[in-house]
Amino acid sequence: LSPEAEESYLVTASDSWSGWWGSDWIRSDDALSGYDRGGTSDTLMSLSGLPDFKTESTEEVGLPPLLLEKWASEGRLEQEQNELDAFFEENKLPKTVLNYEIKWLTDWVAEYGIDGFRCDTAKHIDQKCWAELKKYASLALEEWRKANPGKTDFETPFWTVGEAWDHGVVKDTYFETGMFDAMINFSFRKNLLKGYSILPKLYTFMSDTMRKEDISVLSYISSHDTAL
C-alpha cells in the first residue's frame, strides 16, 4: 500500500495507541504515536511492517493496557495476575517481555499437552530466547503428562523446529544455542530442481551429514514462500 492508502485506515498519529500494547512492549515501523521504530538488525527490525515485541529487553514491565482492560471486563484480571506472579516467583524470573511471552506460550503446553512448536522466521528472535522457550515448554509438557496419565503412549521430549530463510543441512548455532531439534531445509527444493536423478546422491549427502553432525532437518518440495 502507498503511505496515503495506509493512512486512510491506520491513524498512526492518534494518542489512542497508548492504550494498546505500549512502548515498553513493542516497536513498530508504522510510526505509531509514542512507539519506537524498528531497528536494522534481524532481531530488532519490524518484519514486513509488523509490530515487534521487545524480547531483547531486560527491563521489567507491567501488563499492557489492552490486557488490563480486556481481563478486567471479563472479570478475570486478578486470576491472570496471580497466575503470572506465581510463574515468575516459582521460576525466579524477572517480569520481562520475553518471560511474559514464555508464560503465555507454555500455557498452551500445560493445558493441552502440545508437544512441539514450529518456530517461524526464527532469525528475528535472539537464539537464546528460543532456548529459554524450549526449556519452559519442556517443563510444562512434563506437568501436563503428570496431570494426564495414560492420555498419551509416548514420552518423547518437547520438540522444536525452526524456520530460518535459506537454511540447509548444516549444524550451526540454531542447534547449539537456540536448542532447536530440527531446522527446515530450504536446500532440498533447490537441488531437486536439477532433476530427479540427483535424489540418490542428495539423500546420501543428507543422511551422512545428519548422522555425522547429530542433527535433523525438515525438508519440503514447495511452500507459500517459494515455487516448485
Language-model segments: which ranges?
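Substrate-binding/active-site clefts of carbohydrate-active enzymes
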Residues: 1-107, 111, 133, 137, ...
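Active-site-proximal helices and loops of the catalytic beta/alpha 8
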Residues: 2-22, 103-220, 226
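Active-site rim elements
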Residues: 88-94, 118-121, 227-228
